[in-house]
């Protein structure tokens, strides 16, 4: 009979009988126990289940890591975009700063320039306010200034009326026969010297000669509207270097009604040094008040041969006459 014996726990050892009696060889057959086979299958199945679970867990972890990596990549991209925008803003600010930057000392320079212009304007206004009517416009023809009794320090933006002051010259053999006192003329802008007429002079004429009074040339007088309206025209004259008299009645209220001698008187009293050389010229051309108001610089320069400085000054005085509002009709 076959005898079976187990040498191991999971293996069944069975002796196989031989038919040769002389041979001492012993044969055994080994078989695995069924229980062990079932147990091994269970172990393998459990191991496979555990492996699948681990693989699933690993896959989940890898998926989460990939998500985190993608999020970090997106953050890096956004950070790069923000950095580029910030750098662009910084470059724009620096560029605008350098473009609109004022030069060194620009503020101080502009302040000085504005102050300089303001001072220049103030000086110009002061010069205009302190403008004296007999002002020279020619560098070769200076104008004498009145120092003591001339009211030239007052501002004259327009024609002004000042009180007429009578002069009291020394007695002269020729002038002592003048019966009437000095009366103001109707011309209100310029400073006239007092003048006297001889007995031979009549109203409306400029005839009569006399010798000049040296003290009468330095006296400058103006008059007010009250004196002008109250004083009747009298037979008085003005004393000049050509030893002739001009009656006061020939100088009327408006320049357009002046006679030739009244225009000559205007030239001599306005600016003696600059305009006295034009006396003979005006007399030769018989320029009266209307012609005086129509004179221009071109006519003076081209047709009358007057120098530029003298023409400029005369045109200025004529413009002052045209703009005057003190003449009453």
Curated annotation (Swiss-Prot):
Keyword Phosphoprotein among record annotations: yes
Keyword Calcium: no
Gene3D superfamilies, A to Z: Transcription Factor, Ets-1 (1.10.150.50)
Annotated SAM domain residues: 258-325
The protein's role, per its UniProt record: Putative Polycomb group (PcG) protein. PcG proteins act by forming multiprotein complexes, which are required to maintain the transcriptionally repressive state of homeotic genes throughout development. May be involved in spermatogenesis during sexual maturation.
GO cellular component terms given for this protein: nucleus
Family statement drawn from the similarity comment of this UniProt entry: Belongs to the SCM family.
InterPro entries per the UniProt record, alphabetical: SAM (IPR001660), SAM/pointed_sf (IPR013761), SAM_Scm-like (IPR047531)
Organism of origin: Nomascus leucogenys
Residue numbers of Phosphoserine PTMs: 138, 238
Alphabetical UniProt keywords: Nucleus, Phosphoprotein, Repressor, Transcription, Transcription regulation
Record localization: Nucleus
UniProt protein name: Sex comb on midleg-like protein 1
């Amino acid at each position: 009979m076959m005898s079976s014996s187990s040498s191991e726990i999971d293996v069944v050892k069975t002796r196989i009988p031989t038919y040769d009696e002389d041979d001492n060889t012993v044969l055994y057959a080994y078989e695995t126990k069924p229980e062990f086979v079932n147990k091994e299958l269970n172990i393998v199945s459990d191991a496979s289940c555990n492996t699948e679970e681990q693989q699933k867990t690993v896959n989940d972890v890898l998926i989460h890591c990939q998500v985190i990596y993608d999020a970090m990549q997106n953050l890096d991209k956004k950070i790069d975009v923000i950095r580029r925008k910030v750098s662009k803003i910084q470059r724009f600010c620096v560029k605008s700063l350098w473009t609109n930057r004022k030069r060194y000392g620009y503020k101080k320079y502009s302040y000085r320039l504005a102050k300089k212009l303001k001072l220049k304007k103030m000086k110009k206004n002061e010069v205009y306010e302190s403008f004296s009517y007999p002002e020279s416009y020619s560098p070769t023809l200076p104008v004498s200034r009145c120092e003591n009794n001339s009211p030239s320090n007052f501002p004259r933006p327009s024609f002004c009326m000042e009180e007429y002051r009578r002069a009291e010259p020394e007695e002269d053999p020729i002038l002592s026969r003048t019966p009437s006192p000095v009366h103001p003329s109707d011309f209100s802008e310029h400073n006239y010297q007092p003048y006297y007429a001889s007995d031979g002079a009549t109203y409306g004429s400029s005839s009569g000669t006399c010798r000049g009074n040296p003290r009468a040339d330095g006296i400058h007088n103006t008059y007010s509207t009250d004196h002008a309206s109250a004083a009747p025209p009298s037979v008085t004259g003005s004393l000049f270097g050509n030893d002739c008299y001009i009656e006061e009645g020939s100088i009327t209220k408006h320049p357009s009604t002046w006679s030739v001698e009244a225009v000559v008187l205007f030239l001599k009293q306005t600016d003696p040094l600059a305009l006295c050389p034009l006396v003979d010229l005006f007399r030769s051309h018989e320029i009266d008040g209307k012609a005086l108001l129509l004179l221009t610089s071109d006519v003076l320069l081209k047709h009358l041969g007057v120098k530029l400085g003298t023409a400029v000054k005369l045109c200025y005085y004529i413009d002052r006459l045209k703009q005057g509002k003190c003449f009453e009709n």
